[in-house]
Swiss-Prot record:
Pfam families: Flu_NS2
An individual GO BP term: exit of virus from host cell nucleus through nuclear pore
Keywords: Host nucleus, Host-virus interaction, Transport, Virion
Family: Belongs to the influenza viruses NEP family.
Protein name: Nuclear export protein
Origin: domain of life: Viruses
Gene name of the encoded protein: NS
Function statement: Mediates the nuclear export of encapsidated genomic RNAs (ribonucleoproteins, RNPs). Acts as an adapter between viral RNPs complexes and the nuclear export machinery of the cell. Possesses no intrinsic RNA-binding activity, but includes a C-terminal M1-binding domain. This domain is believed to allow recognition of RNPs bound to the protein M1.
Assembly: Interacts with protein M1. May interact with host nucleoporin RAB/HRB and exportin XPO1/CRM1.
GO cellular component: host cell nucleus; virion component
Residue positions of motif Nuclear export signal: 12-21, 85-94
Subcellular location: Virion; Host nucleus
UniProt keyword annotation of Ion transport present: no
Keyword match Transport: yes
Length: 121
């Protein structure tokens, strides 16, 4: 993962963790957990691509990697919808900026994962 994407993940996670969204803090914690999981998955997929020919290693580590890939895309779509929803309902400019940046990052990561997966297929 390039350093800009890495720092974007870290920045957004830090700022989201500081937010207090009232009764929905449990939902926010779930979003933070999914962001972290997505970051780890994206990193591992990127490493496999960097070691081109490592498809067999990836398949042996996770025989159902295509199913996992599909699940990750579903998680990304859910996160995108959740972030869009939060963006619509919040009036706090700090939260709006954070969620706009989170949305942009999700779209970038979705594209990167698509690119990596096509290289591995």
């Amino acid at each position: 993962m390039d350093s800009n994407t890495m720092s974007s993940f870290q920045d957004i996670l830090m700022r989201m963790s500081k937010m207090q969204l009232g009764s929905s803090s449990e939902d926010l914690n779930g979003m933070i957990t999914q962001f972290e999981s997505l970051k780890l998955y994206r990193d591992s997929l990127g490493e496999a691509v960097m070691r081109m020919g490592d498809l067999h290693s990836l398949q042996s580590r996770n025989g159902k990697w295509r199913e996992q890939l599909s699940q990750k895309f579903e998680e990304i779509r859910w996160l995108i919808e959740e972030v869009r929803h939060r963006l619509k309902i919040t009036e706090n400019s700090f939260e709006q900026i954070t969620f706009m940046q989170a949305l942009q990052l999700l779209l970038e990561v979705e594209q990167e994962i698509r690119t990596f997966s096509f290289q591995l297929i």
